[in-house]
Curated annotation (Swiss-Prot):
Disulfide bonds join C80-C124, C295-C307. Its main location: secreted. This is Lipase 1. Belongs to the type-B carboxylesterase/lipase family. It is found in: Secreted. Gene3D superfamilies: alpha/beta hydrolase (3.40.50.1820). The gene is LIP1.
């Protein structure tokens, strides 16, 4: 009886030990604790910079000067101030009848991801670490650093818990540490115009990301990660951020003499040939934002900026939402108004020029797209039902382009339902007479063209490319739409989830997506073969990246079509 009691006591004690909160030691002796979630140790809401408040609003992030001692890293931090994504989804609902066309198993997770950004605060520069349970500081596991998307106007690391990646990495026998970083978006992170340029605080959101990467370099070993094996990856604006981290400081991705990252994955995003931070577009965005915030734009640049810094967070949040929602959906005008722009500092030249001249970090990468990227954005032009309507809309979007340039776009993307997006659906899915045409233009302008620019310019690194078609003929009007792959990576472990998780985990471990995946061999992209992986719902095939060459090439060369 005594021995049985001792056994039970030992078992209870062991269970208590196993259930203890995971810990990590920072700065030599400052202990933080996290939460054990099944097979994953989680540390959420770790500050990596001082709060960008008061005089630090709109400025580059400053190193964290507080203490970590006793931090209970149990919960995600609030999102940074931003456009309300729930409004965007609601407008899509009204415009497309989203509830009718997106299957419930997809629609629910989309709204769940949006909920991750409901709580907002300017004090938002925090990151999260996910690792296999029980990982020791000397484990030296590869690190996957996630940069979220959201058109540079919304998004939050809380919407993308890393549990799915860590669990699958354990299953594969290729364990990783997953890190996600908050960064400022919209005017809080990408305010442009003469005033902010003169002050030297452009592209604050990019600097937030880089400050997070510096924190990883300094601290991730304390969580069992290897700072010499860091992969950055993201989707949409997150992928565009990855592209701009590749060209930051002309390709110098070093910090304290060591590389900040060693590989990259760009999902549905790449470099965009934005005009510089003091050009017409950013100035328009700056002045509209200031006006909506109640600041006098006729005053001096310094006075206007001081006024903006004096306003409450709620006033600026309302101002941003007023600007974003002034059009039907408002995403594209805002998308072209805010975002990373050349500033002579972190982005020293135009993005395409930096890649084409070899001024980028020489690391292996993967870049790919969904087949129908533009369908989620096409509602901005739902009222354009004739060619003259579309031309007028293009003149608004491409405000710096000549009439000849716009006419060429219209000729390359005719009002022929069978060649519009969703692609390969014949005359079906024509929500309006011009919907498929506009969707095709946006697919190629914003996503396909930047991907091909990168591939053609980066001949001296190993690179892989893919096209996802797994929702073909499954979702009316939207097809394999922008952002759907996130559902499979973070929410629903069905269909192509294995392809995304396993290829990407292998790439983080080996700089090769093919090791230990039990998936189709994914061949490297070459200029001669243009090898491309096509991701299906349950299987994959290799194909050639040779679709819509003339239309996509036009966007590669006519950069005045971008703002």
């Amino acid at each position: 009886m005594v021995s049985k009691s001792l056994f039970l006591a030992a078992a209870v004690n062991l269970a208590g030990v196993l259930a203890q909160a995971p810990t990590a030691v920072l700065n030599g002796n400052e202990v933080i604790s996290g939460v054990l979630e099944g097979k994953v140790d989680t540390f959420k809401g770790i500050p990596f910079a001082d709060p960008p408040l008061n005089d630090l609003r709109f400025k580059h992030p400053q190193p964290f000067t507080g203490s970590y001692q006793g931090l209970k890293a149990n919960d995600f931090s609030p999102a940074c101030m931003q456009l309300d994504p729930g409004n965007s989804l609601t407008l899509l609902d009204k415009a497309l009848g989203l509830a009718k066309v997106i299957p419930e198993e997809f629609r629910g997770p989309l709204y769940d991801m949006a909920k991750g950004t409901v709580s907002m605060n300017e004090d938002c520069l925090y990151l999260n670490v996910f690792r296999p349970a029980g990982t020791k500081p000397d484990a030296k596991l590869p690190v996957m650093v996630w940069i979220y998307g959201g058109a540079f106007v919304y998004g939050s690391s809380a919407a993308y818990p890393g549990n799915s990646y860590v669990k699958e990495s354990i299953n594969m026998g290729q364990p990783v540490v997953f890190v996600s970083i908050n960064y400022r978006t919209g005017p809080f992170g990408f305010l442009g115009g003469d005033a902010i340029t003169a002050e030297g605080n452009t592209n604050a959101g990019l600097h937030d990301q880089r400050k997070g990467l510096e924190w990883v370099s300094d601290n991730i070993a304390n969580f069992g990660g290897d700072p010499d094996k860091v992969m950055i990856f993201g989707e949409s604006a997150g992928a565009m951020s990855v592209a701009h981290q590749l060209i930051a400081y002309g390709g110098d991705n070093t910090y304290n003499g060591k590389k900040l990252f060693h590989s990259a994955i760009l999902q549905s995003g790449g470099p965009l040939p934005y005009h510089d931070s003091s050009s017409v577009g950013p100035d328009i965005s700056y002045n509209r934002f200031a006006q909506y915030a109640g600041c006098d734009t006729s005053a001096s640049a310094n006075d206007t900026l001081e006024c903006l810094r004096s306003k409450s967070s709620s006033v600026l949040h309302d101002a941003q939402n007023s600007y974003d929602l002034k059009d039907l959906f408002g995403l594209l005008p805002q998308f072209l108004g805010f975002g990373p722009r050349p500033d002579g500092n972190i982005i020293p030249d135009a993005a395409y020029e930096l890649f084409r001249s070899g001024r980028y970090a020489k690391v292996p990468y993967i870049s790919g797209n969904q087949e129908d990227e533009g369908t989620a954005f096409a509602p901005v032009a739902l009222n354009a039902t004739t060619t003259p309507h579309v031309k007028k809309w293009l003149q608004y979007i491409f405000y710096d382009a000549s009439e000849a340039s716009i006419d060429r776009v219209l000729s390359l993307y005719p009002q022929t339902l069978s060649v519009g997006s969703p692609f390969r659906t014949g005359i079906l899915n024509a929500l309006t007479p011009q919907f498929k045409r506009v969707a095709a233009i946006l697919s190629d302008m914003l996503f396909q063209s930047p991907r091909r620019v990168m591939l053609s310019a980066t001949k001296d690194v190993n690179r892989w490319t893919y096209l996802s078609t797994h929702l073909h003929n499954l979702v009316p009007f939207l097809g394999t739409f922008h952002g759907n792959e996130l559902i499979f990576q973070f929410n629903v472990n069905i269909g192509p989830a294995n392809s995304y998780l396993r290829y990407f985990i292998s790439f983080a471990n080996h700089h090769d997506p093919n090791v230990g995946t039990n998936l189709l061999q994914w061949d490297q992209y070459t200029d001669e073969g243009k090898e491309m992986l096509e991701i299906h719902m349950t299987d994959n095939v290799m194909r050639t990246d040779d679709y819509r060459i003339e239309g996509i090439s036009n966007f590669e060369t006519d950069v005045n079509l971008y703002g």
